[in-house]
Amino acid sequence: ERYREFLSRLHDPIIEKLKKGAKGLDYGCGPGPALALMFKEENFSMDIYDPFFFPDKSCFSEQYDFITCTEVAEHFFQPLKEFKKIDQILVKGGWFGLMTSIYDDSICFEDWYYRKDPTHVVFYSFETIKALAALMSWSYERRENNVVLFQK
């Protein structure tokens, strides 16, 4: 229940943007695709992809109305390559929901809990988010709780 509450930080704002029957992908869903289940419970079609737990690459030949990426982007060894993959399978006008801890100057990087996880190999600031949006020609909305919604 607490995990679903955590995931609702991305689920709730993106679901407001979706049309009935929208098709989604949980990109980097991990071993238990709880977010995909939350969307399915609300009658959205959901596919899942995770390079370790659900490595079926057939999603890369599909097109999606929305894509979620929750606590995943900090694990990208080649972030631009991953974001380009996402862009290729997101329909024009589609939504990409990103949740990751966003670094800012109020955080002492050396003490930051997020950087202490050895699997976190890249970090994002709001400047990074703006640059990513510009590079990909996406618009964006920064939401609370480390959530950003991009629209293609």
Question: How would you label these PLM feature ranges?
Answer:
Residues 66-79:
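A short SAM/SAH-binding and catalytic strip from SAM-dependent methyltransferases
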Residues 109-117:
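Short glycine/proline- and charge-enriched loop/turn segments
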Residues 53, 101-106, 122:
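Short "lid" loop at the C-terminus of a central beta-strand within the Rossmann-like core
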Residues 1-66, 81-84, 99, 116-117, ...:
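Conserved N-terminal segment of class I S-adenosyl-L-methionine
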Residues 93-102:
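Conserved beta-strand signature within the Rossmann-like core of class I S-adenosyl-L-methionine
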